[in-house]
Design a protein with these regions (language model features):
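Conserved lysine of the Walker
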Residues: 68
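Hydrophobic positions on the alpha1 helix immediately C-terminal to the Walker A/P-loop
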Residues: 71
Length: 198
């Protein structure tokens, strides 16, 4: 794949494109091109799992292996909240309000949506031997968002676009830090914090 330095175009070259074994690689290459195009439209991608609760999308984010899918499944099992996307979520702001936009990339979960939802909030997970919700100071909120975004950052301008979006999004939505176990109580603690905030 070749991408113009200013991200204005991407060209995918594939030898033997009809070979079924190449399908997954082509799919992921197209995802990369999509990330570039989305960013040009002020849409940014957060590595996270999303659920639908109280009429809004809620995201669980954290580094790989933190338990994003596990936590979303705790909610699904206990509160019957549908999982919207199991790996990547597109975020944007329209008329001053944050939204989640569906997309067909979902990691190994095979769970995704192509529907748009208002964004309720984002929960950054951290494994711990206890379950406790903390609020984050505004400067840390933008930093946490930046750390989990997978939108391109290979030039200073692209990095600054991501940072500007994170700084704009943070005050428009609820952002939590959940120190948690992988037990059902973790979902109960987080649900109580969300319910209290809405």
């Amino acid at each position: 794949m070749r991408v113009k330095k200013d991200s204005s175009a991407a060209v995918l070259y594939c030898v033997d494109a009809d070979n079924k074994d190449h399908a997954e690689n082509i799919f992921h290459a197209l995802r990369f091109a999509f990330l570039i195009a989305a960013q040009k439209q002020a849409l940014f991608v957060l590595h996270s799992v999303s659920i639908f609760y109280q009429g809004k999308a809620w995201l669980f984010s954290g580094s790989s292996g933190t338990g994003k899918s596990t936590h979303a499944n705790l909610w699904a099992n206990r509160y019957h909240t549908p999982v919207l996307n199991g790996d990547l979520n597109v975020l944007g702001i329209k008329n001053g309000l944050p939204y989640l936009y569906g997309l067909p990339w979902c990691g190994t979960s095979e769970t995704y949506t192509t529907t748009t939802y208002p964004l309720g909030g984002i929960v950054f997970l951290k494994q711990a031997p206890f379950n406790r919700v903390n609020s984050l100071p505004p400067d840390e909120q933008a930093l946490f968002l930046m750390q989990r975004m997978i939108s391109p950052t290979w030039t200073k301008d692209l990095l600054l676009k991501n940072l500007a979006f994170a700084e704009t999004l943070a005050p428009l939505t609820k952002i939590f830090r959940l120190n948690c176990t992988k037990n059902p109580e973790a979902a109960a603690v987080m649900k109580a914090a969300i319910d209290q905030s809405i």
